[in-house]
């Protein structure tokens, strides 16, 4: 299934310029921004949320506000449990970053730039999708808390590589009694990092089908040259859960029917690619939680998946707050 989603490509370097322009605009209009500052907790009173507590050296600095908006990572999950913020366990996506030659994806890249494809491979029929496609892009490493290394991808507006990369993600929706989806995905990532000595692991698709690891010498002789130069050749299947790995393999076979050559032996799979969406916070159409004055945004709220939709949610929140102020 192809999801129709028209986009305009901004590029990593252009995005940085845009974010800086936004930051400068806020600063010029009197908005105080604090970086490298830890928010310890929220301030709750009988009437609702009244502010936040920031770490200020060895003490806590209270910052009061009529409206508090949270757009964080798994810290919000802890807040939900501590303060009884209405929520339900969210989805986590576990998968790989796939890299192939540009000519394999040439027709798709020219027509769509980023194709969003969804499938439900047998036997489990879990939702598997493509995400964050980067024609002429580069595979990159991100580092999360506790030195968790995960793979990602990006592309520049001007500088291009000979490869296209994209994520293939398997959605995991857990049921009772399990309620720690983020911790589950983190463990998968930690195990992969252990096998790769702290580095991202990469394996050729053909080697996976042959039941063998990829060696550095083989990778160096491959037609597809990895754009993440310090990725370690190895066996990603030793850490990837069987169900997720099977879904990924079957989905690649399905994609090969649409994009011939995608399932080539030389296609590279990097691991781990993890997307943490936190628990889904219950909110109404005004983005109000069950606690008065408290709102949640972006992927941490469990309502969006990706930068674009998280940004749109931020614009919506701004408009709602402006309406309350009569602006």
Regions found by a protein language model. Name each.
Residues 1-327:
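Residues forming the flavin
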């Amino acid at each position: 299934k192809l999801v129709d989603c028209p986009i305009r490509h901004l590029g990593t370097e252009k995005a940085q310029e845009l974010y800086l322009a936004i930051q400068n605009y806020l600063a010029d209009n009197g908005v105080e921004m604090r970086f490298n500052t830890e928010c310890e907790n929220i301030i709750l009173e009988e009437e609702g949320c009244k502010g936040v507590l920031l770490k200020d050296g060895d003490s806590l600095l209270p910052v009061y506000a009529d409206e508090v908006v949270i757009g964080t990572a798994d810290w919000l999950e802890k807040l939900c449990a501590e303060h009884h913020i209405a929520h339900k366990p969210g989805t986590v996506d576990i998968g790989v970053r796939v890299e192939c030659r540009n000519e394999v994806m040439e027709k798709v890249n020219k027509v769509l730039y980023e194709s969003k494809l969804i499938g439900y491979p047998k036997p489990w029929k879990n939702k598997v999708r493509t995400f964050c496609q980067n024609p002429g892009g580069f595979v990159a490493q991100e580092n999360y808390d506790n030195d968790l290394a995960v793979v990602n991808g990006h592309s520049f507006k001007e500088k291009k590589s000979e490869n296209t990369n994209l994520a293939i993600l398997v959605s995991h929706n857990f049921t009772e009694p399990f309620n720690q989806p983020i911790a589950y995905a983190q463990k998968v990532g930690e195990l992969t990092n252990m096998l790769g000595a702290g580095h991202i692991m990469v394996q050729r698709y053909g080697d996976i089908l042959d039941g063998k690891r990829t060696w550095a010498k083989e990778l160096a002789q491959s037609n597809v040259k990895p754009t993440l130069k310090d990725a370690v050749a190895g066996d990603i299947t030793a850490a990837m859960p069987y169900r997720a790995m099977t879904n990924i393999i079957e989905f690649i076979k399905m994609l090969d029917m649409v994009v011939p050559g995608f399932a080539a032996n030389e296609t590279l799979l990097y691991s781990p690619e993890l997307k943490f969406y936190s628990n889904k916070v219950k909110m109404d159409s005004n983005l109000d939680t069950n606690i008065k004055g408290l709102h949640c945004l972006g992927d941490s709220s469990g309502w969006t998946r990706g930068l674009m939709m998280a940004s749109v949610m931020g614009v919506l929140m701004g408009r709602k707050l402006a309406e309350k102020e009569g602006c």
